């Protein structure tokens, strides 16, 4: 009989779960340890038995993790991808992800898959698959496109079947679903069309799968609340032919078709599945365990605080977001038999039976395909490389374009580059772009008068470059004080060091307004401040309005007196932008850039105090603009967020407060910032009080609904 034991909270730390929940929960190389990746910037290693985190790692602000972190079971290292293309590898001894091994890939990654006994696989969004070792040998290698246009990967699973690796992934296009099965021992990729049957209008909400000797049992939970099964052969009869598979009804009406927070399905063993959702239209979310062999509900647990519609299962533990905390529910299923009741249960397993373990196979494959390049040597070596990145791939360059770069004029080079970019992308497109930029930069160093900025800007806009691939690019742009090129690099490169970011900030603050007027910069992040509607009362009030909140309890009498004495011209100055619009666009690019506070603060101390004051005035102006509306956002296509504004205010004050406080012209600004922070603290304090009150009301209103459950107990007679 299957049973769900008492749940417990893995950590009281509130995870950064987005609208779709967490990115994933993956098992570590220790049985009791798991990697949890939130939907923002953080990976946390938890130990379930101790109910506490063992380590936490975050990418820089401005970067975002795009697929769950996994463990490389061969080396004990962890692997994660942020910003779709940047791969990071680290271990427990590493503290900061900025200093660990990094590789910038040539295509966007969908998921990294890892199981015991083999190296991880990297599945790209275009359907191609690479072994991790083969990919690290040449990160910029060409990645082929497997799936068709507008086809999107929805789900994937990695199995080990009789020492052979099998990968399955499901795609969707215009409501049609397809299954791809990759056999790595024979390098066979088979495509199947999944026919939905009679209910063609239903949408598949969740997938799960188990495997036996001949078939992959693909189970899907549809929007009609039913679970369907599709049997996919592991060894197809005709791999070259696109075959169709019809699904069959497995369980009917296991969840309501009106579930708001989504549903989830996961296989527990060959006979049981866990379903997360609302069983009835008016009921709360529940975690239910069903016996698919006898089509019966085994047990159910109500989740009163709601979930994210996600569930993961490893080693007799079910993981899910319950409310705001990561919750673990132990699961056990013991086989009832007459022999067990008599104490004569056979403990030796019949060789003919096959039981699906937590990982399908723990044995190591020998000589499997897909890039097993001397993996024995790689298993013994931990990657402790901190900053070693191959700056240029070793693929032969395009000789014609490179010869043009080395000897022709800037206009001719620009024409040739434009012709190359207008052509359809070739297999060596990424390599040629990298080599072209390298050749241009080498000639710039050799000939100071040579500076093909138009060519460089066109190549940057191909979205295949990064700072680690061409670090000399921004160095030359800084020497030339080319703010347009620097702005473009800040917008396109996800891995710019903090020292370079601060160097750009110095130039953006020091360049004259006359020089900016002659420069063409991107203005999409800036709106017309002069045409914005101001509330006339805003100029007269002395307090900061924080989202409609007026801190009447502010007792800073001295501050109030100082602000009440300010002349009219200074009042207008506080409600008008302190910088011209083009400088504002450049500063917005700085606000959007990724950074690590530890490495950024030392460089901020080198910026002159008058420039720091100007930047603080601009940030304070942006905050006032945010506070004019209830959403606390700025108009525009890609404006700075309130969090970015507050982060930079704190950083600038932390680095330069002792210098700024001595400047008479900064006195009023510091008083305004003081009141700003005080009002923020007051608002969040009141919000916390409201949250506590809501929790108490929720506890009073909770009612436990007793549902009548039944089960079929199977007795095995020997």
Curated annotation (Swiss-Prot):
Database matches in Pfam families: Nol11_C (PF20998), NOL11_N (PF08168)
UniProt record, GO biological process: maturation of SSU-rRNA; positive regulation of transcription of nucleolar large rRNA by RNA polymerase I
Domain of life: Eukaryota
Keyword list, A-Z: Activator, Methylation, Nucleus, Ribosome biogenesis, rRNA processing, Transcription, Transcription regulation
Main location group: nucleus
Record-level GO cellular component terms: nucleolus; t-UTP complex
Recorded GO MF terms: RNA binding
Location(s) in or outside the cell: Nucleus, Nucleolus
Residue numbers of N6-methyllysine PTMs: 346
Quaternary organization: Interacts with UTP4. Interacts with FBL/fibrillarin in a transcription-dependent manner. May associate with the proposed t-UTP subcomplex of the SSU processome containing at least UTP4, WDR43, HEATR1, UTP15, WDR75.
Function: Ribosome biogenesis factor. May be required for both optimal rDNA transcription and small subunit (SSU) pre-rRNA processing at sites A', A0, 1 and 2b.
Protein name in the entry: Nucleolar protein 11
Organism: Pongo abelii (Sumatran orangutan)
């Amino acid at each position: 009989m299957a049973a769900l034991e008492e749940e417990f909270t893995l950590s009281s730390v509130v995870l950064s779960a987005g609208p779709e929940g967490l990115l994933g929960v993956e098992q570590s190389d220790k049985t009791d340890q798991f990697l949890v990746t939130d939907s923002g910037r953080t990976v946390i290693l938890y130990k379930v038995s101790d109910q506490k985190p063992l380590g936490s790692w975050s990418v820089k602000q401005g970067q975002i993790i795009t697929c769950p972190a996994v463990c490389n079971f061969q080396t004990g290292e962890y692997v994660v991808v942020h910003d779709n293309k940047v791969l990071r590898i680290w271990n427990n001894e590493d503290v900061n992800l900025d200093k660990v091994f990094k590789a910038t890939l040539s295509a966007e990654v969908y998921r990294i898959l890892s199981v015991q006994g083999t190296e991880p696989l990297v599945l790209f969004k275009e359907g191609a698959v690479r072994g991790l070792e083969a990919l690290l040998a040449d990160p910029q290698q060409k990645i082929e496109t497997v799936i068709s246009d507008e086809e999107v990967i929805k789900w994937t699973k990695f199995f080990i079947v009789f020492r052979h690796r099998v990968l399955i992934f499901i795609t969707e296009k215009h409501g049609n679903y397809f299954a791809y099965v990759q056999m790595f021992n024979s390098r066979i990729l088979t495509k199947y069309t999944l026919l939905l049957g009679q209910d063609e209008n239903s949408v598949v909400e969740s997938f799960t799968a188990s495997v036996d000797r001949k078939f992959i049992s693909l189970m899907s939970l549809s929007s009609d609340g039913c679970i369907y099964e599709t049997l996919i052969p592991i060894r197809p009869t005709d791999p070259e032919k696109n075959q169709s598979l019809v699904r069959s009804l497995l369980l009917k009406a296991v969840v309501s078709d009106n579930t708001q927070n989504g549903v989830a399905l996961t296989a527990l063993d060959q006979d049981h599945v866990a379903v997360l959702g609302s069983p009835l239209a008016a009921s709360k979310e529940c975690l239910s365990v069903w016996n698919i062999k006898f089509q019966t509900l085994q047990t159910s647990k109500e989740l009163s605080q709601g979930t994210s519609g996600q569930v993961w299962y490893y080693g007799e533990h079910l993981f899910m977001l319950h409310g705001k905390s990561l919750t673990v529910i132990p699961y056990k299923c013991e086989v009832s038999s007459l022999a067990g009741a008599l104490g004569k249960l056979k403990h030796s397993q019949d060789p003919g039976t096959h039981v699906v373990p937590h990982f399908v196979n723990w044995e190591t494959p020998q000589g499997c395909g897909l890039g097993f390049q001397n993996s024995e040597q790689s298993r013994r070596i931990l990657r402790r490389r901190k900053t070693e990145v191959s700056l240029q791939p070793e693929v032969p360059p395009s000789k014609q374009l490179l010869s043009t770069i080395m000897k022709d004029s800037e206009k001719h080079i620009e024409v040739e580059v434009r012709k190359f970019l207008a052509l359809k992308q070739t297999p060596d497109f990424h390599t040629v772009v990298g080599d072209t930029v390298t050749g241009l930069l080498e000639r710039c160093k050799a000939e100071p008068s040579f500076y093909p900025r138009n060519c460089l800007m066109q190549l940057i806009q191909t979205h295949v470059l990064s700072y680690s691939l061409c670090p000399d690019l921004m160095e030359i742009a800084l020497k030339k004080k080319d703010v347009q090129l620097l702005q473009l690099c800040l917008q396109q490169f996800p891995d710019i060091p903090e020292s370079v970011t601060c160097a750009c900030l110095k130039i953006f603050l020091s360049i004259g307004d006359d020089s900016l007027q002659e420069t063409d910069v991107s203005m999409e992040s800036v709106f017309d401040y002069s045409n914005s509607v101001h509330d006339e009362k805003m100029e007269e009030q002395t307090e900061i309005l924080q989202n409609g909140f007026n801190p009447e309890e502010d007792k800073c009498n001295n501050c109030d007196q100082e602000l009440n004495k300010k002349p009219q011209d200074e009042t207008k100055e506080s409600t008008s932008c302190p910088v011209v619009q083009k400088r504002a666009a450049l500063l917005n690019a700085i606000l959007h850039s990724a950074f690590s506070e530890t490495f950024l603060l030392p460089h901020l101390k080198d910026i002159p105090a008058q420039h720091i004051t100007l930047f603080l005035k601009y940030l304070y102006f942006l905050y006032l603009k945010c506070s004019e509306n209830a959403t606390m956002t700025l108009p525009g296509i890609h404006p700075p967020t309130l969090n970015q504004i507050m982060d930079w205010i704190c950083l600038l004050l932390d680095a330069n407060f002792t210098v700024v406080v001595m400047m008479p012209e900064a006195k009023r600004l510091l008083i305004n910032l003081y009141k700003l922070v005080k009002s923020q603290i007051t608002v969040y304090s009141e919000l916390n009080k409201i949250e506590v009150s809501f929790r108490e009301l929720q506890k009073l209103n909770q009612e436990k609904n007793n549902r009548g459950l039944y089960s079929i107990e199977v007795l095995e007679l020997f």
